[in-house]
């Protein structure tokens, strides 16, 4: 619990051990000792039978964590998972892309080129929205400002404190960005880089503000009147809200990665801007020049 993520105003935590993390986040409803832990030693020993037995022993919505470090570890777990599922077990899985790749037996692919990513030419500009407050994101944003041809707009997210003001701010940004994108200019909209904190604040109140700010930010995409050539969302919550709420994506084609850990979707026909490349850029991913 010593990283900047652990100290997050809304989603902070104390426990770094995932078993203890689950106990912390469930308020003690799930005890750390009751969490099934698939050890790295079992994975490296390719103990398929042992891991399968652990999975078969899970019941009543029990929790499982997998201590995988590399793709080879994930592949071992995927085999044991398949075997347990073949015996009638059902699991709800929350994971990163590595498990999807292993389960689907998807081979390594080269990083995307512009030709692979852009399937329909457009003279419009793109839209970039930055919600993450991590130090890495802020450094990356400053690096991006060195690129010519992008207009940078900082949303005054502190207006969330005054009813109706943040919505007015977002509406003005939407109108301006729509005009610029239609002219072929790419716009980058970011929240203020300093997280808003208040005296005697509570995590619940901070979460309410965070949701309101995220809604305002995603509306800068969802209410555009011009179709952008591409969409980039920086930050976990931001990228989720932009994909689901703003772009209204129900089905998308995963084109691949533009950089390690940065996937690209091609939005479906049902979405707000069909066939548009959507770059999902997590807040803690990449280096400063990425």
Give the ranges of each region predicted by the language model:
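Active-site histidine-anchored catalytic micro-motif
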Residues: 1-16, 228, 233-236, 240-289
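Cap/lid and interdomain-hinge subdomains that line or gate substrate/regulatory clefts
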Residues: 1-74
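Generic secondary-structure signature for well-ordered alpha-helical cores
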Residues: 10-13, 20-31, 56, 60, ...
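General beta-strand structural signal in soluble alpha/beta enzymes
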Residues: 30-39, 64-68, 91-96, 101, ...
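Long, internal scaffold/assembly segments composed of regular secondary structure
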Residues: 71-135, 146
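A glycine- and small/hydrophobic-rich beta-loop-beta segment
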Residues: 116-217
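Extended C-terminal subregions enriched in glycine
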Residues: 207-237, 243
């Amino acid at each position: 619990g010593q990283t900047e993520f652990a100290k997050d105003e809304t989603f902070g935590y104390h426990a770094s051990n995932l078993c203890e993390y689950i106990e912390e986040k469930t308020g003690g409803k799930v005890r750390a000792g009751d969490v099934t832990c698939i050890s790295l030693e079992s994975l490296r020993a390719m103990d398929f039978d042992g891991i399968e037995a652990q999975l078969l022993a899970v019941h009543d919505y029990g929790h499982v964590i997998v201590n995988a470090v590399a793709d080879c570890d994930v592949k071992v777990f995927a085999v044991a998972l398949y075997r347990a599922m073949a015996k009638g077990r059902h699991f709800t899985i929350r994971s990163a892309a590595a498990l999807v790749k292993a389960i689907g037996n998807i081979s390594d692919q080269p990083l995307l080129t512009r030709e692979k990513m852009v399937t329909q030419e457009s003279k419009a500009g793109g839209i970039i929205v930055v919600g993450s407050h991590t130090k890495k994101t802020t450094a990356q944003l400053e690096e991006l400002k060195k690129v010519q041809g992008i207009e940078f707009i900082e949303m005054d997210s502190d207006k969330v404190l005054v009813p109706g003001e943040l919505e007015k701010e977002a509406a003005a940004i939407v109108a301006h960005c729509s005009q610029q994108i239609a002219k072929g200019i790419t716009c980058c909209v970011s929240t203020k880089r300093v997280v808003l904190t208040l005296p005697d604040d509570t995590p619940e109140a901070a979460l309410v503000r965070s949701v309101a700010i995220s809604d305002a930010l995603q509306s800068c995409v969802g209410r555009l009147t011009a179709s952008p050539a591409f969409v980039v969302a920086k930050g976990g919550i931001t990228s989720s809200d932009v994909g689901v709420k703003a772009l209204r994506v129900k089905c998308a084609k995963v084109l691949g990665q533009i950089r390690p850990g940065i996937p690209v979707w091609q939005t479906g026909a049902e979405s707000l801007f069909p066939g548009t490349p959507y770059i999902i850029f997590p807040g803690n991913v990449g280096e400063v020049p990425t």
